[in-house]
Amino acid sequence: MQKGLELAEKLECWFMEYFPTSQRKDIAQSMIFELQDKLVEKEYLSSKLYYDLGSYSGNASYSSTRNNYLAAIVTAQNVLKEYPYTKMREELSILILRAKYHMAKESVLEKREDRMRETVDEYYAFKNEFPESKYMKEVEVIYADVSKYISTDEE
């Protein structure tokens, strides 16, 4: 399905490029935006699935418990890079924060503090971009928990 949506988007962009004065320009533009929204939603659902799988490793005997969280982070970040003005930016951003938080909590001791710091960075990025977010209470709870793991002494 994604290949079909991407092909349709390319065809509509081609139409806009070769027929910029067409009477159907506005229709083509709105169709492009609609297709982009569908692609973003599909990728969001993929990212959310990875997040929901969390530390589940299935039948894999080699699997790291954090692969699903990492996949959720990478998928959501790629969507934000490709479609920076998406309507789902807040949902993708909170998903990244949640996944980084859970990945950090489940990390081995050697990596935990660094990953907690990455989570704090993501917290500040989220808070700056969405100061009035409906997720702000959850974000503050994550920050409070993460702060416990980060050493503050500069020795």
Which stretches of residues belong to each language-model region?
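Acidic, polar-rich low-complexity tracts and alpha-helical solenoid repeat scaffolds
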Residues: 1-155
